[in-house]
């Protein structure tokens, strides 16, 4: 706010609004007003004594400055004014010791790293993935076949990050799942629960059946791996071996399966296995085992349900380290536990429904007991990097706890819905690398537990719901974002850190349940010390957002959304779906009076509004109505319609407002009437008049409704999406001071003078169906920043737009091209430039896609030239004025540090693109965000010249080839002086067989040369003729039935064939012989008959 206010208690104290406004470009603000880095303990004690010396222990503006200078803390005027406004939270311009210390405490709390760990969403917020188990019976065992271990030496442990680059789901990193059922069937699954193969298993004979197993190993292979077995008899056995060359699991030639007898292992007949037994470690069956390589300790637990026998003094979990045993005594024993080596804690759960957190080295008493389950605990695990504990009970309820504060964060009960109530014997396994909890039974269910952010897909989210309002506070130099998740978050844009988060800011009770209400509007007070927010249910709240304290509660009409709020000196204006402006007092002593209702001239819901300090207010509705109001009196003076902006519209009260005033008038007349009869008659007459007027209005409404239905599509109203006042433009007839954004993508410009009106309009989008949802400008009203419904950010140069010709200035295009790469020439005219190529004013200087969804709010920081956008895609992003991407608030990636005193952006720095925009970005967006343009000029030659050049080039190539062939003859000898075949090696090559596998890959060790096709010799003519002859061509089947009692040979004389060689005597003799043979056979057959 650039207006000057003498907000003082006495005449000696002058606080001006202009001191915190960014309109003061001449004041040097290189000095920080932060006291926390400059004050010491001795100085703080001196300040305390100075406060005690003053009457009432309160200091004014100049007094506090003198006290600070006495302890060598000196500020210039602008910085000290900013510091005093930060300290003075009571708005009385007097500072006491409590306010001073509170300011220091809140400043130190902002530096607390624990505030950065608080999540915006619930730990389990992703829907579970369910698929069939493909087993005949329920899954009884679930394991993970992994390459990387969960344990690592301390010198190799790196800081775990909360983001990933998308490669953690590979088989090498995430491993394979293995499920088994009671019939001995085993199935192998990928990390995404896709089936791979099926196998069968057989159990070996041990003294007691193994109930639980665990495996501990290091990735480097320098420490012996350990296989831990816990059986039904309470015994624990450990097999240690070296993982070098697969240890004892090397394959032997000729043996497909290696069988090991436990007695031979104990006798040392297998030197690669080192056994160790803990006989009768528990008196009940072992329920869970774990071996910590870091602590060199064994953990084993058991359940003790026989309370009469053990009387609650049972060792639920036993830790064995270097021969020493430590008993963690828990009633009813322990079903499951988890060891977090990084925190040196053990989390246990058992049949007593309690989750206990123990220090590993203090087994006598738990550090914390978490209560809330109604059934026995069957699974617990810890996420040390997120400080969260997960517990699952017998009734399939999952609870998430904070590890440090020991508070309940979430109760997840979807497993009850997904799994049948009769199915209780379930198997659980937590994949620490993928952060997934797998539940196996008749089904396989995968639940994401606080998953990492995929930075190859997104930079993260700012809110857990769409961002509705983005504000920059010039006093505290921070960004405040409000969202539809009912969160208010304070950010430090220079370091990217989150300072304060306030959850459930607007709520209401529905059937005993507290429901969060979306925040739809927000603004600061004139001194920018407090925050005003409006919600969808019509509630308003004033916040001291530095300590998350609500100062005042207000409300317009119930269940009427607040769409715009304005805070001016001593007054608060709120408007929304109630179709009128509600004014609240901001004067001490009159805050809690009834609000003032401005006249209801609007006939539809108010969608937006803005203020020109000291002059007026503009409001716009969903039906396209625009009304200008006097700020001091609250009276309207002009009314427009965006569909017919040049038509004069008379200011008339709405029918609802007229009816309300008429009823108030009759109600006021009734008590002052002379007699009861007169009052009764008057009221009766008033009711008749009301009935007549109501029936007449209903009849008119029906007729109008029929006309509207008949002409629907012709008179569809055009709604107003956003309005913006240019604060630096005067109230004259020739200055366009109000920008009105329509849902058609057009921005209209009006003059808010009493005799002014519509001046001009321009198209602000380049896609059909897009429109401008939010607008902002810089302090000198040189640039207009717009955010569209399709996620585009556009910057317009409006210095010479809608102003008198005498005030127009020269536009230096080379300077603009240096600041905005969008203006540089390209080979082809892009879509954003084609739309405005015939539009002289205003000048489009930048256009790029900043979000995938609609941009709901936009703001601008003047000194560092930073654009802030809040979108419907849950993110709030920072951009330079030229369009370079700086970062997303709440991102898990490292932040590029910025300065509030220097311009953001460096031409030599290569800026990256947001991952989600990179996949859909156009050439214009890629050029603007990256700041790079590849200049490749393309010439367009004449077609005829091109053909001639192609012919000349072809002739030249042919000539060069001929010259290469005939100009220089080949040199003899062509094949060289000699040609020698490669000789054979005199040494035999030794082949080393790989015996580490279960089979010997012989063919991989053989050198096989590629085979060549042999030349096939031609077949001689005689052989070809013999192959072609058919000696059975005369044996043809006999027609009709064949008598089986007769001769076995029935021959039918064939018809005489024409021979190619009729003159050959051999052919004649052969034919005669065949004829004789046929006659002879026939005669013999006849004689026999």
Swiss-Prot record:
WD repeats: 155-199, 207-249, 329-368, 372-411, 462-501, 514-553, 601-641, 767-806, 850-889
SMART domains attached to this UniProt entry: WD40
Source species, domain of life: Eukaryota
Keyword vocabulary terms for this entry: Repeat, WD repeat
InterPro entries the UniProt entry points to: EF-hand-dom_pair (IPR011992), Quino_amine_DH_bsu (IPR011044), WD-EF-hand_domain (IPR051242), WD40/YVTN_repeat-like_dom_sf (IPR015943), WD40_repeat_dom_sf (IPR036322), WD40_rpt (IPR001680)
Biased composition range(s): Low complexity: 672-684
Disordered: annotated span: 661-684, 1049-1089
PANTHER family xref list: EF-HAND CALCIUM BINDING DOMAIN 8, WD40 REPEAT DOMAIN 95
Protein name: WD repeat-containing protein on Y chromosome
Organism encoding this protein: Drosophila willistoni (Fruit fly)
Organism lineage string: Eukaryota, Metazoa, Ecdysozoa, Arthropoda, Hexapoda
